[in-house]
A protein has these predicted regions:
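Low-complexity, Ser/Thr/Pro/Gly-enriched N-terminal "stalk/linker" regions
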Residues: 5, 11-65
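Well-ordered alpha-helical scaffold segments within catalytic/enzyme domains
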Residues: 12-20, 77-90, 131-146, 184-196, ...
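Solvent-exposed loop and edge beta-strand segments that line ligand/cofactor-binding
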Residues: 17-21, 57-74, 114-130, 168-181, ...
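Long, well-ordered core segments of solenoidal/helical folds
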Residues: 28-41, 53, 96-114, 153-170, ...
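Extended ligand-binding groove/face enriched in aromatic
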Residues: 74, 83-192
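Carbohydrate-active enzyme catalytic cores, enriched for enzymes
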Residues: 103, 107-117, 230-235, 239-247, ...
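Active-site-proximal alpha-helical scaffolds that flank and shape metal-associated catalytic sites
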Residues: 124-131, 175-186, 190-193, 209-261
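Fungal-biased detection of long, low-complexity, Ser/Thr-
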Residues: 268, 272-349
Length: 349
């Protein structure tokens, strides 16, 4: 992919939509279709209980067997669904629809459900993969067509699992990677509100406030060396989603009281990525993209006269520009980064 962001913001974001330009969206889709059905390499993360469990990834993951791992394949499908909804007349749109018709069948959904129903898979992909699956379900619902209904047995199962899990999750997980609970709740809340699942939505709001409502004076000791999420900023984004506007502004002022001065500095400066062939270090490109997403979401809730707002928007653009040229630099990033670029460009409340 050519370094589009170096050509200027007009080539990145549509002036009419809170979205990437059609050209960039098509590039994202081409990139994703190139790996979403690529079976290898593939990272297995499930628990094996016997010889019968050692099977090809495609056997146990009949839909989500590509893109290096289960969760990346899930959010690759989310990207395609979002692009299709944004620009249904793109030249690549028929390829996306054909892929969805082949991927989303009742039999394949049943195969995905079967894995989750195994006793050893109780915590499989919790919470990151769960959240992305729910995000995909929400997008398919908005898109229309049969695919969301076909996937409903799996999305319903995962929503129920999350409802059962949250009441006993006494503490948040504040990591910068897959186990971060704030990120998972941001995505799951979108599903709950789209599906009108009030039980899940209320649980998410309740848990977010219990975990983070009293947080203040965040020190933001980040990034860590393999972060793709900012624990500080994704927490703030979650609270932006669950609190009333005035309440969020008060909470944010206490959470990052020096933000108007650009501190903590680490939150405003893009992370350096020293080796994009190293799967863990390559996470830092994702960190820069997810920070752009978070800063844009936070800025949208701040008063126009608040000096933090401009700093947040500038930081978002700097983080986006640092990562966009590198989405296909190596397969360690190529199999997932475009989804986070799309979040940064169009997922602002």
């Amino acid at each position: 992919m050519r370094p589009i962001c170096r050509a200027g913001a007009a080539l990145i974001r549509s002036a009419e939509l809170n979205a990437p330009t059609p050209e960039l969206a098509a590039n994202f889709a081409v990139l994703t279709l190139g790996h979403i059905a690529r079976p290898y390499p593939y990272a297995l993360t499930r628990v094996v209980t016997g010889p019968g469990d050692v099977v090809e990834p495609r056997v146990q993951h009949p839909i989500f067997f590509g893109s290096f791992d289960w969760h990346s394949c899930v959010h690759g499908h989310w990207l395609l669904a979002r692009v299709l909804r944004l620009y249904p007349d793109l030249e690549i749109a028929p390829r996306i629809r054909a892929h969805f018709d082949a991927a989303f069948t009742a039999a394949k959904t049943a195969g995905e459900v079967a894995l989750f129903e195994r006793p050893a898979s109780r915590g499989f992909e919790r919470p990151y993969g769960w959240a992305w699956l729910l995000k995909l379900a929400a997008e398919l619902s908005r898109l229309g067509g049969p695919w969301g209904e076909i996937l409903a047995p799996l999305s319903g199962l995962i929503a129920a699992r999350l409802c059962a899990f949250l009441p006993k999750a006494d503490y948040p997980i504040r990591s910068g990677a897959h186990f971060n609970t704030a990120f998972a709740l941001v995505l799951a809340l979108d599903y709950a509100r789209t599906a009108r699942d009030d039980v899940l939505a209320d649980l998410i709001v309740e848990k977010a406030c219990a975990w983070h409502g009293a947080d203040a004076d965040c020190q933001a000791w980040e990034p860590s060396g393999d972060d793709f999420l900012s624990p500080a900023l994704v927490e703030a984004l979650l609270m932006r989603r669950v609190l009333e506007l005035a309440t969020f502004r008060r909470w944010f002022a206490a959470f990052l009281p020096q933000a108007s001065a650009g501190r903590p500095v680490s939150l405003f400066v893009p992370a350096r990525v020293s080796d994009r062939t190293d799967g863990k270090i390559a996470h830092l490109d994702g960190l820069n993209l997810s920070r752009a997403w978070c800063w844009r979401g936070i800025a949208s809730a701040l008063d126009a006269a608040d000096p933090v707002r401009n700093r947040a928007l500038v930081a978002a653009e700097q983080h986006l520009a640092s990562a966009l040229p590198h989405l296909s630099a190596d397969y360690m990033g190529e199999h997932w980064l475009a989804s986070f670029a799309l979040l940064a460009l169009c997922e602002v409340p």
